Amino acid sequence: MMEENRAEQLLFLWEKISEGEIRLLRVFGEQPVVTVPGFIDGRCVRELGDYCFSRRKLPENEIRYSRYCGGMWESGLSVLKDKEKKDHISSEQEENIVSLETIERDGKLHELSEKYIKEVQLPADIVKIGSCAFYNCTKMERISVYPKLVEVGGDAFMNCLNLRSLRMCAGVEEPTGLKQLLAQIKWQVEVSFEQEDGEREAVLLYPEYYESYDEIGPAHIFELNLTGEGFRARQCFKEGVILLNAYDEIFPQACVEESAEVLIPMAWNRLYAACGLSLEARAAYETYVREQSGKVLAILLKKRELKPLHFFFEKGYGRKEQIEDAVAIASHEEWMEGVASLIAWKRQLFAEPEKTADVKSRYSFEEF
């Protein structure tokens, strides 16, 4: 996993959970994209501590550091102030010591928190994300997790409103901690179940939902109101496994409450990665995609991905005149690969039936 970080320097602050397990407390790096290693200093990374990716006070327990640079590791004791470092050195403690002040003065290293974190991939053995672990990470867009993650602390993603993509490195039929993650993300987010080779088994869009309270009578009793189908979608689990049929059943009501910007990716994602899709649900999604075919095509052209575009026309969601329009748009945008592919698909999928010999003879006679 550290191969993805090999070209850069990373520094981790952590504390022991047990002799072989640690809790991550801080991450420093050169880039706002990080792959957290599964092992640090020979110990398994089991948890993200509270406020791990947020600028908040560190715990008062003994804190260790591990620095990774160019494929090599260095570990030792971490202290907050330079003065504390001098005190430890004067006491002839025989190990590396680094102060937080020294780390923060490093011109290359940035604390990966708040506005300087964009994407995080967690290791396979993490079981817990602490409370407020990503508090105020306003630029974070994507997080990747594994099925062993089952505990997510309160407000773990508070104010992470740009977090729109959640990658589950698991099969869609595996029990995961996805429900716990979604409970902390009330805004719209796309979840993809991906295998090790990157193949997407299923992609699900969870719409945003809102909570409000109405006061009932003088007794100061409050009634909770939920707006949006996103809440219902987030309940479609049994023993950690997502219930795809239950998820699909919310679509008819979502068509009443949600906008096309929400419904198009909901329908398209289920058709394109159609794991566990019933005939009834497929028919409902296909009807909607055909009704919105112009908007769907515009989205696909903007992404410049050939496989989904071919799927769109191959399945009959797009018409002949739309593929002609798509050729013109791709040409205008100077996407030559797209132009060539669209022209080939037009010939393949919308070929004119050849005239019979009798028709050809009749046309020749009339022309004569």
Model features per residue range: what roles?
Residues M2, A7-E21, F28-R46, L58-K128, ...:
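Structural signature of tandem-repeat unit edges
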Residues A284-Q292, Y317-E324, E337, R347-K360:
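Ankyrin repeat arrays, specifically the small/polar loop and inter-repeat linker segments at the C-terminal end
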Residues W268-Y285, K307-L309:
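Repeat-mediated protein-protein interaction surfaces in helical alpha-solenoids
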Residues I299-L300, A326, A330:
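Ankyrin-repeat helical register
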Residues E305-F313, W335-A344, A351:
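Ankyrin repeat structural motif
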Residues K320, Y363-F368:
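Extended, charge-rich intrinsically disordered regulatory tails
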Residues L48-D50:
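Extracellular beta-strand-rich solenoid/capping regions of secreted or surface-exposed proteins
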